A protein has these predicted regions:
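Bacterial N-terminal signal peptides that target proteins for export
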Residues: 1-9
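Generic detector of short alpha-helix boundary/capping microenvironments
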Residues: 9-10, 221
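C-terminal motif of bacterial Sec signal peptides marking the signal peptidase cleavage site
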Residues: 18-20
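Mature soluble binding/inhibitory domains
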Residues: 22-263
């Protein structure tokens, strides 16, 4: 996966868009948007659901997001999971590295690419997901998600989420080893279960199955052609309006990030 992410800096990042907001101007980095970019923002459900007491929901849910810090040693991919405890969607501190997620006067509703960092997406109010790429083979790549976790989790009812994803793998079988795509999830708050998928062009679908605990979820990530793995994530915003997370193969051969919004 390390080789895939290093290659990512030279290929897929060119597909991300950067939009300028207002009279402050934009960046000369602007490129064509991915064909799978979602053009509209879904309207959240207006159903009023019972909610968990915020203290109970967060007894052991103190982290706000996490990152995979990816390096290569002796031709083996090494992945370290780093937890965040700061609900900052503008900047992250990861393994001694500062990652800027937003810039004054610049807005990108879809993927935003500045320098070696790609972030998704301005259309989400409470969560960000993306990748910060190394500038050379001796540096580390960082795949991350973070945001403002839900304090009032629903305890009954069903919800569906749709959003964005990125998949990085040596086994995609395309000209590049990475691709942006979509995410789709169904949640049963009463049963505390989440199921869904991460999809992208030319990539075997990654099926997600997880159990919910508080405002977090953990489970499995499986595909017909990719190695099985694990998934983690959290719900963000009022009444679990949005979600985000990461998935990774058990043998580190692929990794993925995803975000979604309640429909």
């Amino acid at each position: 996966m390390k080789n895939a992410i290093v290659k990512f800096s030279l290929t897929a990042l060119a597909a991300f868009t950067l939009a300028a907001c207002g009279s402050s101007g934009g960046s000369s980095d602007n490129t064509a948007a991915p064909s799978n970019e979602q053009k509209t923002q879904a309207t959240p459900s207006k159903t009023n659901l019972p909610t968990q007491n915020s203290t109970k929901a967060n007894q052991n849910q103190t982290f706000t997001g996490s990152a995979f810090v990816i390096s290569e040693q002796d031709d083996k991919v090494q992945v370290k999971n780093v937890k965040f405890n700061n609900a900052n969607i503008n900047q992250l501190e990861v393994d001694g590295q500062t990652i800027t997620l937003t810039y004054p006067g610049i807005y990108a509703g879809s993927w935003q690419r500045i320098n070696n960092t790609a972030v998704c997406c301005g259309k989400y109010a409470n969560v960000r997901m993306g990748v910060s790429l190394s500038k050379g083979p001796t540096e580390k790549d960082i795949l991350f998600y973070n945001g403002a976790p839900t304090q009032n989790m629903p305890v009954t009812g069903l919800a569906s989420y749709k959003g964005d994803s990125i998949i990085l793998s040596d086994d995609i079988g395309d000209d590049s080893d990475e691709v942006v795509g979509q995410s789709s999830f169904d949640v049963n708050f009463g049963a505390k279960t989440l199921s869904g998928s991460i999809t992208a062009n030319n990539v075997p679908t990654i099926n997600i199955s997880a159990n919910i605990s508080g405002n977090s979820f953990e489970g499995t990530a499986k595909s017909t052609k990719l190695t099985d793995g694990a998934v983690e994530g959290k719900f963000y915003g009022n009444n679990a309006l949005e979600l985000g997370g990461l998935a990774k193969a058990n043998d580190n051969s692929w990794g993925a990030g995803f975000v979604g919004k309640k429909q």
